[in-house]
Amino acid sequence: MGKYEDMLIEHDYIEVIECDNLPKRLSGLWLGDMILINRNLPITSKLETLAEELAHNELTYGSIVDQSNFNHRKFEGYARRLAYEKLVPLKDIVKAFLQGIHNLYELANFFEVTESFVLQSITHYKRKFGHSTRYGKYVIQFEPLRVFEYKDIWILHIKGGGLLKNI
């Protein structure tokens, strides 16, 4: 079972219907207690759409379909960023690198999303944290994407009476 199916099971209190009659510009639509998802999307795009529509459930209220309204675009952005953080979390970026995953194609397969979604997630994290961030004992650098284990380095300060000093 993949992440899309897992997410459907986790949120089984919400009816998710895959349909053919959504407008071309919409991959999914939140309708209060129901989510419609375009049936013709690949499974990776369905997962991305489901995560974003679930984020709308958490963050927004009412209809925000009219994207000419500034506040509607703002709420759309909030939901998209939450979807990035749910589907490509920092802890799993570390996990992927520890498993030897080092290129975009492998990362997209690891997260079960499109390569474009991985790139958008990394861009989101760069905007949120800057060039890099710490996660536990790791440093995640966003461009180029790399993960390093962070270690404190202690040196012996001989002249000062043999004290250990953290640098």
Where are these regions (language model features)?
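Active-site hotspot residues in diverse enzymes, especially metal/ion-binding acidic/histidine motifs
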Residues: M1-I167
